[in-house]
Amino acid sequence: MTAKICIVIKSFENQRSGLLLNTRKIGLPKKQTLYTVLRSPHIDKKSREQFEMRIHKQLLVIETETHKLREKLNWLKLHDLLGVQVKIIFYYQTRLDKVCKS
């Protein structure tokens, strides 16, 4: 039986996902926020500074056999990415159920 692992990666920098073989990489839309701050607290309203924050998102899909699921999960735990928020979703199929999501 097959299982599918979906990994959502969020980071401030564009990440390389070349660390996994047999994966599909799907680019998700970037979120861009712009902040404008006054430079001086009292006068000079025209003097402002602008800051920008970009959040890059990617979706990685790994299809594997259910008996190799533990190996893939341990591999993902060992090779963690620094400065990245990771959300992992497992889809698997059993003999009794059609499709299970956990």
From Swiss-Prot:
Keyword field: Mitochondrion, Ribonucleoprotein, Ribosomal protein
Species of origin: Marchantia polymorpha
Signal peptide: none
Keyword Metal-binding: no
Compartments it resides in: Mitochondrion
This protein's name: Small ribosomal subunit protein uS10m
Keyword hit for Cytoplasm: no
Record-level GO BP terms: translation
Matching Pfam families: Ribosomal_S10 (PF00338)
GO cellular component, one term: mitochondrion
Family named by the database record: Belongs to the universal ribosomal protein uS10 family.
Molecular function via GO: structural constituent of ribosome
